[in-house]
Structures are given as structure tokens and as C-alpha cells.
Amino acid sequence: MFPNAAIAADKFHLIQELNRRVDKVRLRTMNQLKNYKLMDLKNADAASIEKAERMRKQYYLYKKFNWLLFTNDPAYTDPNREKKYNKVLQGYYNYNDILHYMCLYNPELEEAMNLKDRMIYFYKNSDLDNARKDINELISAFRDCKVPEISSFANTMTRWKTEIINSFIVTNEHGRKINSGIIENRNRTIKCIKHNSNGYTNWKRFRNRVLYVLNKDTTYHLYPKEGENENEQ
């Protein structure tokens, strides 16, 4: 229907898939530590008790602070953030310290996080002219990774390479990169309409409701549109 259309892979979905793989590394680490968490230490020697306690603290970090691996808010990982006492860790730590220890205890997780940061840097700093060169370097870095969950992501990037490069095309009208943000927003709005109504049995009524909600020129809004006086609604 549109032979000249450029198909683009939205960065949100690509990073989401990479985050899933990073989380698999975290879960694998937790499973390896679970035996120490459940160990009976009644008759154990001092060395075994010390090791088990250390492993339990590591398990606690990966279980409690898993969200730190995926946050995009630099305020959380600010090294100057106030440190607070943690009963389990028995010391004063901020989120930057905790993230540091999570990566320190598992070199594979650290490697996965470094590649995730490289992917985010790629999307922030590359452009259409350099995207092909940059993505080839990124694919090579992923392929050289020793972490199985992460190295296989190179195949995903290779398969969608053209679509990823197309996502750096900037539209002249708005000066924005091509993405599926508008479509995702419309789909979410329609799902909310269906959810709030507990479903529709009449197609025409459902269609009219969707068109009314998505139409910017509707005469009534729950919140006044920007630049309009409330009395004009």
C-alpha cells in the first residue's frame, strides 16, 4: 500500500527487550545464591557462616534493588545522594553504592549493564549519517560479550538493523525522529476506554466514543486545553 514507506524499529521496544535480558542475568545470579540463603547454619563452621551471610546480603541486593538496574533517573544514582543506614547490609549506603556493589559481585551483570549503557548512548548521540557505522560497532560489542543472555541480542540487532537505522530519520515537519509513540498513545487510550466501560457490545457506539475522545476539536474537555480560559469550555 505504501511502497516508499520507511519502516522503523521503535527504540522503546528494543531497550525493553534488552532490559529483559539484563534481568535474566540478575535472576540467574539470584538462583545461584538461593542455596546459601536457605542453608542451615546450626552446625556450620565460622568460615561457612561468614560466606553464607555474605551470599545472603548479595541475594538481598538483587531481590530488593532490582529496579536500580533499569532506572533512567540520574538523581537515584547520584554519588552525592544522602546515605542512609541499611539494617540488612549493616552500614550507610546510597543507591549509587548499592548499584556499584550489585555489579561488583557479578562481573557478568556489570558487563551487561555496560552494554545497556552503550545502547542508550547510541540512541542519544548517533544520527542518521553515523547510525550504520555506530550500530555495526555496537553489534560487534554485543557479539563479543561472554554473557549468553546478552550476546544473543546481537542477532536481534542484526535482524532489525535497517529498521533501527530508519528510526534516526528526522521528519521535516516536527524535527523529531520517527517513532511509534503516537500509535502507542492511541492504542493505550482505546484500551482505557474499553476498560472504563467494562466493554462495549455496540460497535457504532464504541466507534463514536473513540472518535470523540481522540478528536482534539471536541467541545468538552476534562481539563482545559492549553491557552484556553476555563470559562470558554
Placement of each model-derived feature along the sequence:
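Short alpha-helix plus adjacent loop in nuclease-associated cores
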Residues: 14-38
